[in-house]
Amino acid sequence: MLGRAQRTLKRKVCYSGVGVHFGKAAMLTLEPAEENTGVVFSRHAASEQYIPARLANVCGTGRSTTLSLDGSVISTVEHLLASLYSFGVDNVRIYCSEDEIPIGDGSAQVFMDLIDQAGIQEQEQTVQIARLAHPVYYQYQDTILAAFPSDEFKISYTLHYSHNSTIGTQYRSLVISEESFRKEIAPCRTFALYSELCFLMEKGLIGGGCVGNAVLFKDDGVISLGKLRFPDEPVRHKILDLIGDLSLVGTPFLAHVIAVGSGHSSNIALGNRILEALQHEQELVK
């Protein structure tokens, strides 16, 4: 295994905003944490009850990723987690006054800005970076995910919307680093099909959604606050979600992840298979 110094934030930072699904205004606070704390969530700063950002605590994957433990719930964690993971922040306490992380403008930009504002502090203890030793796969209907051994963390994603010609088929392959995340992935906003709006509202979702925090795709065009940030913004946002979901493996790892049409549920399924493989390989080493 490779290793590097563990990292946390230098100072506390705060942000207030609205959750995209439940529409509640929330205060988000990120605080430095001691070595080996990991990424943990809590509803209240005075509380000693935390939800570790781990696959075992995933309780929902419908249009976002939700974590829960002992009755505490926090949803729409994926954009924040992707930012922390891509910036190599291992230890942080996250407090949110409501049960959903604020959405910002629908991208990871606000979280990247928060991390920049806080600064990053290296710590004395190290974290091991695991390397996948053999391929793992997940498939459900037309959704396919695979992770292959690699000396870098790379994602190759194919998005195919045969029912929406505005999106169509998009492909992006990228080695994930702080620099590539900052320039290529973080600015990309969440999106939905215009035809899905009634269904999502009936499900009690997108209560805080608006053109300021999401891009809507119609068959004949795009509804957006300003132009698309990239011609293939949707597939880049899918990579953003995938990074956040895979960060729940709970340790940095190297692999080439190939995804075709995946969403939160299948991302988590692959994450579990990666975790099982890494744990098995660790047992073999022992």
Curated annotation (Swiss-Prot):
It catalyses: a UDP-3-O-[(3R)-3-hydroxyacyl]-N-acetyl-alpha-D-glucosamine + H2O = a UDP-3-O-[(3R)-3-hydroxyacyl]-alpha-D-glucosamine + acetate. Zn(2+) binds at H79, H237, D241. It holds the Pfam family LpxC. It comes from the Bacteria. Pathway: Glycolipid biosynthesis; lipid IV(A) biosynthesis; lipid IV(A) from (3R)-3-hydroxytetradecanoyl-[acyl-carrier-protein] and UDP-N-acetyl-alpha-D-glucosamine: step 2/6. Keywords: Hydrolase, Lipid A biosynthesis, Lipid biosynthesis, Lipid metabolism, Metal-binding, Zinc. Its EC number is 3.5.1.108. One of its GO terms (biological process) is lipid A biosynthetic process. One of its GO terms (molecular function) is metal ion binding. Its cofactor is Zn(2+). GO terms for cellular component: membrane. Transmembrane segments: none annotated. Belongs to the LpxC family. This is UDP-3-O-acyl-N-acetylglucosamine deacetylase. It comes from Chlamydia trachomatis serovar L2 (strain ATCC VR-902B / DSM 19102 / 434/Bu). The gene is lpxC.
